A protein has these predicted regions:
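Structural motif
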Residues: 15-19, 99-103, 126, 203-205
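N-terminal beta-strand-loop-alpha-helix module at the start
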Residues: 1-63
Length: 220
């Protein structure tokens, strides 16, 4: 069973062509590292070796293709992210930790989120960890009090919570529309339940020290 908080139980790391964590992140994970096209360039700069480079390979430095194994997928109807996910699925390397999903052009980021919503993977963009909670799902999360958390319905969802500063009671969340951004945990354990739709859950690794810690509580 994979652990969305401690990043354990995942079968691979998929690197997209965005902002990547530092080298120490990769050295502590004993799983295959797969680079989606140009992400291999960033891994090289970090001194991290991918097990495979895949995609249409129009962004990776040619020298790296002489050094590391690669799989060229020419299909222009899918993104490098989707091509890499196809490889992971075929080779039983899911669920995966997805890094590099942010950074770069806004349209790329939005498309990456769109693809991510269809997966059972973990988004890791320090200091944020993210995952999708689907319809009729429940989860208990052990988090430090005052941990910042955002809950976004994509495209629309109904969710309830226990243990947040601004509780949600059958709250309708939608994108575009109203969401629960920059909420905070009140207790060491919180409970989330999605009644309908899918929710993107984004959790900050560090406790956030700001004025929100002393703001009066309110209910949705």
């Amino acid at each position: 069973m994979h652990d969305v908080i401690n990043l354990t139980g995942y079968r691979s790391i998929l690197c997209l062509n965005g902002d990547l964590p530092g080298p120490s992140f990769f050295s502590t994970k004993n799983v295959p590292i797969i680079a989606a096209d140009g992400a291999a360039n960033h891994l090289f700069d970090l001194g991290v070796q991918p097990q495979l480079i895949t995609g249409d390979l129009d962004s990776v430095h040619p020298d790296l293709l002489e050094t590391y194994p690669f799989l060229h997928v020419a299909d222009q109807s899918s993104s490098d992210y989707q091509k890499a996910m196809g490889y992971l699925k075929k080779n039983d390397l899911l669920p995966s930790i997805i890094v590099g999903i942010n950074g770069g052009h806004l349209d790329h980021i939005l498309n990456n989120i769109n693809i991510f919503m269809e997966t059972n993977c973990l988004l890791y963009a320090p200091p944020i960890k993210g995952f999708v909670l689907n319809e009729q799902s429940r989860i208990n999360l052990a988090l430090l009090p005052h941990t910042k958390i955002s809950l976004i319905g994509i495209p629309i969802a109904t969710l309830s919570s226990i243990g947040l500063q601004w509780e949600l009671h059958n709250a309708q969340l939608s994108f575009p529309g109203t969401n629960s951004c920059f909420n905070r945990t009140l207790h060491p354990e919180i409970f989330l339940e999605v009644h309908q739709g899918s929710v993107l859950v984004l959790i900050y690794e560090q406790m956030i020290e700001d004025a929100g810690l002393t703001a009066p509580s309110q209910n949705w």
